[in-house]
Amino acid sequence: MSQLFQKEITTATEDEMPYSHCMIRIHKNGDSVHVHRDNCNFEMPDYVVSKYQNQLSAILYLQSPRTGGELKIYDKQWSLPDESQRHPEFGYSSSVTDGSNYAVVSPIAGNLLVLNPNFYHQIEPVLGTKHRISIGFFFAESTDDKLFKWS
């Protein structure tokens, strides 16, 4: 990422404590993630990372499942009225994306995906005994033109 953006990437901190560098996700047979978005500008207004604009999410696929586990990315970004369709625990009603076009990304080991986390997305069910394994993190520019990553 440093070479791509020609900037040094620094791990974001909160009260002088660093965020994790990345998150390892293991999705097993039957696992899925319903419609959601990940941008923390609205979710976490008191946190330093919520102040970073133009946030992006990076996902590196380490292992592909035999079947399933595709990432479905909808051509719809979050807006405040969508909060009426929010699930109390996590994510949104699938109706929030009704009528939206979408792209499907297969989780192919070795592929790196960078996306705008403000677009709604979901993970289709993994089928079979081979797990879907990925590493993910967020990154963004600060107002003083520095690049930060966190998870």
Identify the residue ranges that each predicted region occupies.
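Residue-level detector of short, conserved catalytic/binding motifs and their immediate flanks
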Residues: 22, 54-56, 111, 133
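Pocket-edge structural micro-motifs
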Residues: 26-28, 75, 117, 137
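Catalytic core of non-heme Fe(II) oxygenases with the double-stranded beta-helix
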Residues: 29-107, 148
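Catalytic core of Fe(II)/2-oxoglutarate
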Residues: 83-151
